[in-house]
From Swiss-Prot:
InterPro entries, alphabetized: Bactericidal_perm-incr_a/b_dom (IPR017943), BPI/LBP/Plunc (IPR032942), Lipid-bd_serum_glycop_C (IPR001124), Lipid-bd_serum_glycop_N (IPR017942)
Alphabetized GO MF terms: phosphatidylserine binding
Annotated source species: Caenorhabditis elegans
Gene: nrf-5
Gene3D superfamilies linked: Bactericidal permeability-increasing protein, domain 1, Bactericidal permeability-increasing protein, domain 2
UniProt note: phenotype after gene disruption: Increased resistance to fluoxetine-induced nose muscle contraction. Slow development, embryonic lethality and defect in yolk transport to oocytes leading to accumulation of yolk granules in the pseudocoelomic fluid and appearance of pale eggs. Reduced level of sensitivity to dihomo-gamma-linolenic acid-induced sterility. Cell corpses persist significantly longer than in the wild-type, indicating a cell corpse clearance defect.
Descriptive protein name: Nose resistant to fluoxetine protein 5
Disulfide bonds: 151-232
Gene Ontology terms describing biological process: lipid transport; positive regulation of engulfment of apoptotic cell
Primary location: secreted
Chain intervals for the UniProt region annotation (Disordered): 241-265
Tissue expression from the record: Expressed in the body wall muscle cells and detected at the basal surface of pharyngeal cells and basal-lateral membranes of the intestine.
Length: 551
């Protein structure tokens, strides 16, 4: 009896542990996009950073530093050796990293006030054999907290050199202490505070009293987004450097207005509207010895509003994010949030106007029969919210419903020729044949089913019969055949996007999501050239930005 009781107790304990593990997983909110990084990706990024830091820091002259007690000017960084960087995932905890730097030199001019005494002069600080060892642990209990459980900053030598007779030499020990303290704070405190801040970010709904509309940044300030855009720009146009675009003088295109001759684009979106992405960390970082997975909401925001009709899925198959340096699982939730805004705010409505001389061939004969001197207005609007569904076997299917009308406008008459209520199911299932350089994209399945097609107007009956026969039975099969032949024969080259080249890419489908597993490489020389050119252009108009000075 006692033996049976112990067996029963053991089984109950195992079940409770299992339920506890399940419940801890359920406490994480579902996410729209999951990203997995493996150790290979971290090692590659660490190697890139090791090469990049000396190139970025050497000969850099940061802006002046002004505090209540001191003013430091003429800062100049040099003799930055290539550091050794390494990072390793810690199962269930976080990440450990090590940085070792052989040498670092900075020169400056300082003015320091202590009570009634003033000290000023040039000095040079040289740091040797700097070593940083740290562990960042991520803990989740309703909210994510980050702490540096291990943080050691050591150096073999910190020397200060002053000109003969400099009054600053009297403060040598205090200056050394400030430098070491600033290093330790940057590594042990600032990084933790920054990560904790990022983990806690949530979008504030517009109805909240704390809501603030995003303001445009300083056009003369340093912008990561602007730097990224410059990284994506083409350097040359017809063999000549496009320097104006590189410096941000980009020519903009004005949207069509109702006075344009050929077209009118009507939409409820105004110039004051803005888009955003919900970057809430719904699934906090989880770690094994081999990888890290993080989940972001990823939903599209319009004027700060979330898409209420798009629902996050509780269960997504994340186990297949296990093949390459980076794995991305993109839920159907994200495009459906975009479709929600497009439909709710009438952003999918448009009108296009043709003059008699600019009519497409398909409408020229119809124009001669109805009104040869009229201009033609084609309009369309969505009648239902588009819905995207992803199936592991079928691919991604978009359901579109809308009204289409064609009207001929004369001086005295309006000819209402055509109204169509149409529903389309567009199914796409691309695959990627991984190639080291490009990777071919194959459009393996394209199926469109047209149903509920009703037409009005004087030519409704003959046109409806023509569309009912030609579109599904004649036109679409030929288009589909040509598409499949072209895509499968030649493929579409994956571009090198902003210096990032995808390699050995694999694209798969699971229920409700798309999986992308890929290796990647990064064009570091391109980034360094763009970074220095961008900073040089910005520093000429903003004295508060760093600049490169060769001494």
């Amino acid at each position: 009896m006692s033996r049976n009781f112990h067996i029963f107790f053991l089984l109950v304990s195992i079940i409770q542990v299992g339920n506890s593990a399940d419940s801890s997983e359920i406490t994480h909110k579902p996410a729209g996009i999951y990203v997995r990084l493996n150790q290979k990706a971290v090692d590659y990024v660490a190697d890139l950073a090791s090469d990049a830091l000396p190139a970025i820091l050497n000969n850099l002259s940061p802006p002046d530093i002004v505090t209540d007690m001191a003013k430091i000017t003429k800062l100049h960084i040099s003799n930055v050796a290539k550091p050794n960087l390494s990072a390793k995932f810690i199962d269930g905890k976080g990440v450990a990293y090590n940085i070792s730097l052989a040498s670092f030199r900075a020169s400056a001019y300082a003015e320091i006030s202590v009570f009634v005494w003033s000290y000023e002069g040039d000095f040079t600080a040289e740091l040797r054999e700097l070593s940083i060892e740290s562990e960042l642990h991520f803990d989740y209990n309703g909210t994510t907290t980050v702490n540096a459980s291990v943080c050691n900053v050591t150096h073999s030598e910190l020397s200060l050199v002053f000109p003969p007779g400099s009054s600053l030499s009297a403060l040598q020990s205090e200056i050394k202490g400030q430098i070491v303290s600033a290093l330790r704070d940057a590594v042990c405190t600032t990084a933790v505070e920054a990560l904790t801040f990022v983990m806690a970010q949530k979008p504030i709904p517009p109805e909240s009293p704390n809501y603030q509309k995003p303001e445009a940044g300083d056009p003369n300030g340093f912008s990561v987004a602007e730097l990224g855009a410059s990284l994506c720009q083409v350097d040359t146009v017809n063999g000549f450097e496009d320097s104006e675009q590189e410096e941000g003088n980009v020519e903009t295109t004005v949207a069509p207005t109702p006075d344009d001759d050929n077209s009118t684009l009507t939409t409820e979106e105004t110039q004051k509207s803005y888009w955003g992405v919900d970057l809430s960390v719904n699934h906090p970082p989880t770690f094994t010895d081999e990888d890290m997975i993080i989940g972001l909401d990823g939903g599209i925001l319009f004027n700060g509003w979330k898409a209420d009709s798009a629902q996050q899925l509780q269960i997504l198959n994340k186990t297949r994010l296990d093949k390459k340096m980076v794995g991305i699982l993109l839920s159907e939730y994200i495009p459906n949030t975009l479709f929600h805004h497009i439909y709710m705010y009438d952003l999918g409505n448009f009108k296009h106007r043709y003059t008699p001389s600019s009519l497409p061939k398909i409408l020229q004969k119809l124009s001669k029969a109805v009104c040869s001197k009229c201009y033609v207005e084609v309009s369309a609007n969505l009648t239902e919210q588009p819905i995207l569904q992803i199936d592991a076997h079928l691919g991604a299917r978009v359901q579109l419903s809308g009204n289409v009308s064609i009207m001929f406008h004369g001086r005295e008459q309006l000819h209402d020729v055509l109204h169509a209520n149409t529903k389309l199911h567009v199914t796409l299932k691309p695959t990627v044949r991984h190639s080291r350089i490009f990777g071919d994209v194959s459009l393996t399945n394209v199926d469109v089913n047209v149903f509920d097609l009703g037409l009005g107007g004087p030519l409704a009956a003959p046109i409806e019969k023509l569309f009912s026969f030609v579109v599904p039975r004649v036109l679409w099969p030929q288009v589909k055949k040509r598409l499949r032949f072209a895509m499968n024969r030649r493929g579409v080259k994956l571009p090198i996007f902003c210096g990032v080249e995808l390699e050995h890419t694999e694209l798969d489908f699971v229920d409700h999501a798309v999986l992308l597993n890929t290796d990647f490489s990064f064009d570091l020389p391109l980034f360094l050239a763009k970074f220095k050119k961008y900073l040089d252009a910005k520093s000429k108009i903003n004295p508060n930005l760093p600049k490169y000075v060769i001494i």
